[in-house]
Amino acid sequence: RSCEICHNVGNDCDYDYVQECDSPEDQCGTVMLEGSLAPFSVRTIHRNCFSSSLCKLEHFDVNTGNGAYLRGRIHCCDQQKCEGRPFPGLPLSYPNGYVCPGVLRGLFSDSSESEAACKGDETKCITIVGYRKERFLGDIAYNIKGCVSSCPELILSNRTHEERRNELIKVECRDAAKTTPSE
């Protein structure tokens, strides 16, 4: 299988090329990412070869606290070029009494860990640590912690670190802590 490859800031690619996929990356896909550290946000698009297990994730939304979040939409297909799915508006939700550690390191310079107040149906804490190897940018390390509504099934890879690959080092998901109201 061959897939279109591109990485760009915004919602579309200014450039692209086609690359043969290596096993186990057997599907073409597009990942749309949106990261926010209030009041700033940035969207990026990534077209690449993906494993079908990553394609099953479809979307994720991580509340990292203090108005910061990371969300992604994953769309895989059988064509070389998969169109990205648009982001829905952010839901209006209120704190629900659960808390998690929160950090968004690697995407923004302010990456100190804090407490994330979970909102709406967020009752789980997630930690994702890894890096992305990029041909032009070098390695992009990331450490993401925050509240989520459910735990994704992400599998760590034992493959060698190949060019332009996303390498997960740590994925943990657990129940969030319930805060006790102060009197």
Curated annotation (Swiss-Prot):
Glycosylation sites noted in the Swiss-Prot or TrEMBL record? N158
Extract one GO cellular component term from the record: extracellular region
Q: Any signal peptide, and if so, which residues?
A: none
Keyword Signal (UniProt): no
Q: A single GO molecular function, which one? A: phospholipase A2 inhibitor activity
A Pfam short name: PLA2_inh
Q: Which cellular compartments is it found in?
A: Secreted
Q: What is its main location?
A: secreted
Q: Which InterPro entries does this entry report, sorted A to Z?
A: CNF-like_PLA2_Inhibitor, LY6_UPA_recep-like, PLipase_A2-inh_b-type, PLipase_A2_inh_N, Snake_toxin-like_sf
Asked if the keyword Disulfide bond belongs to this entry, the reply reads: yes
Which residues pair up as cystines? C3-C28, C6-C13, C21-C49, C55-C76, C77-C82, C100-C125, C118-C147, C151-C173
Q: Which UniProt keywords apply?
A: Disulfide bond, Glycoprotein, Hydrolase, Phospholipase A2 inhibitor, Secreted
**Tissues with expression:** Expressed by the liver.
Give a short account of what the protein does.
Phospholipase A2 (PA2) inhibitor. Inhibits the enzymatic activity of PA2 of Deinagkistrodon acutus. Also shows a wide anti-hemorrhage activities to D.acutus, Naja atra and Agkistrodon halys venom. The native protein is more potent than the recombinant one.
| Quaternary data | Heterodimer of subunit A and subunit B.
Q: Which family does it belong to?
A: Belongs to the CNF-like-inhibitor family.
What's the protein called, per UniProt? Phospholipase A2 inhibitor gamma subunit A1
Q: Organism classification, top ranks?
A: Eukaryota, Metazoa, Chordata, Craniata, Vertebrata
